[in-house]
Amino acid sequence: MSTKYIFVTGGVVSSIGKGIVAASLGRLLKNRGLKVTIQKFDPYINIDPGTMSPYQHGEVFVTDDGAETDLDLGHYERFIDINLNKYSNVTTGKIYSEVLRKERRGEYLGATVQVIPHITDALKEKIKRAALTTDSDVIITEVGGTVGDIESLPFLEALRQMKADVGADNVMYIHTTLLPYLKAAGEMKTKPTQHSVKELRGLGIQPNMLVIRTEEPAGQGIKNKLAQFCDVAPEAVIESLDVEHLYQIPLNLQAQGMDQIVCDHLKLDAPAADMTEWSAMVDKVMNLKKQVKISLVGKYVELQDAYISVVEALKHSGYVNDVEVKINWVNANDVTAENVAELLSDADGIIVPGGFGQRGTEGKIQAIRYARENDVPMLGVCLGMQLTCIEFARHVLGLEGANSAELAPETKYPIIDIMRDQIDIEDMGGTLRLGLYPSKLKRGSKAAAAYHNQEVVQRRHRHRYEFNNAFREQFEAAGFVFSGVSPDNRLVEIVEIPENKFFVACQYHPELSSRPNRPEELYTAFVTAAVENSN
């Protein structure tokens, strides 16, 4: 069977849920027995989002092979339950840098390097490579931004050319748009969608399906009008209604026959998607009776997308505990020794997630100290693990001024120090310890119990600094347990205080491996401890 290509574009406004629509379709096709992969095209000129501010971009999602990618890849992995790779996120910066390197090496044999064919060919190669490396039946490609953005033009041209390259039966174009509702007039307006499709057709792409984002049901009359003016079949105008829970969306799209229309267009002979397990999960999510309160102490809390995988992992772990996780967003910049008890007193559990830079670190240390001294279940992640070690050094070991060499290079007690292989690296982007690495677990520890007594667990990392082994014996003598280390015992991966109900911190990012129907084990152990603490 020929590989099938589905391209998802957006119009009218950005942030209308293209990624969720693409991920939901991926889940439906996977549940039909098809092998699916998915990728995101981002038209910005950065090589990747690794050096972008979380306020600009939200979370950086790390793949198994160490690519720093768009947060939509997190949605893709959680919905479809697949592990993506570096070919799953492509930016303008990445494409141009590769083309320019080829030009410098003389690979274009003296030709004038142009957007067409060189940039568009490079984009098409990324699409085909993503399919080849995963041996997929179907590849879904989402293009970030909206039709009409000047940055998107080479991407859309590459998508247009794909139809001629692989055949019309192997390509489908899905266009997602906003259908605004004017409350004063009491009606929905189709004109923005019509203009968006007109713009897309002007670039040579005729959409085969429209997905309209609406607050209210559109009605068949609106769908017929859009079908007539946008030249798509009425049944191929699909609603994406606002929902209470994201995981309802695949079921809503299936109910409208979206996946069947896609299969018919692409001539895919696949059985109906069995969504029984997914439906049961959604039903459970919609009927959670109890709540558990988790305080998330972070520096980017004004933009919650900066912690989207953390939030989803907490929710997933709540599902298996039959509780709804209510998150109390605590700005680490506001936390002091004087107000920490007031800010965290009603927390059943406290999580201190990752981050970079000095700002907010002292507030996080106060939150960690509160959790340790008051025996509140606590999970530290990445920087949260490093600050857990610093807090213990200061307030238990009495090492006044203990800090990280990253945050205070002149500290007398560099509890956290730069990794040896990072010392001479000058570039910031793409140079961290990135991707999947193993952690060897200590028998009898809370970490080992969380992971069902596995000897080794593999999780994704994103860091440059590590625990300084010169202090390891001193910590252990005071009851601090290093419950996870690299197989060569050189790098500390997990720490804990066994006397507390749950006081565990890890250098890696467990949230990146969590799925709604298969929550990450360390998060689950943390939420379970928080539930027990609330009773």
Swiss-Prot record:
The keyword ATP-binding applies. It catalyses: UTP + L-glutamine + ATP + H2O = CTP + L-glutamate + ADP + phosphate + 2 H(+); L-glutamine + H2O = L-glutamate + NH4(+); UTP + NH4(+) + ATP = CTP + ADP + phosphate + 2 H(+). Pathway: Pyrimidine metabolism; CTP biosynthesis via de novo pathway; CTP from UDP: step 2/2. Residues 1-268 are annotated as: Amidoligase domain. CTP binds at residues 14, 149-151, 189-194, 225. Keywords: ATP-binding, Glutamine amidotransferase, Ligase, Magnesium, Metal-binding, Nucleotide-binding, Pyrimidine biosynthesis. The keyword Nucleus does not apply. This is CTP synthase. CTPSs have evolved a hybrid strategy for distinguishing between UTP and CTP. The overlapping regions of the product feedback inhibitory and substrate sites recognize a common feature in both compounds, the triphosphate moiety. To differentiate isosteric substrate and product pyrimidine rings, an additional pocket far from the expected kinase/ligase catalytic site, specifically recognizes the cytosine and ribose portions of the product inhibitor. It holds the Pfam family GATase. The lineage of its organism: Bacteria, Bacillati, Bacillota, Bacilli, Lactobacillales. Mg(2+) binds at residues 72, 142. The active site is at 382 (nucleophile), 509, 511.
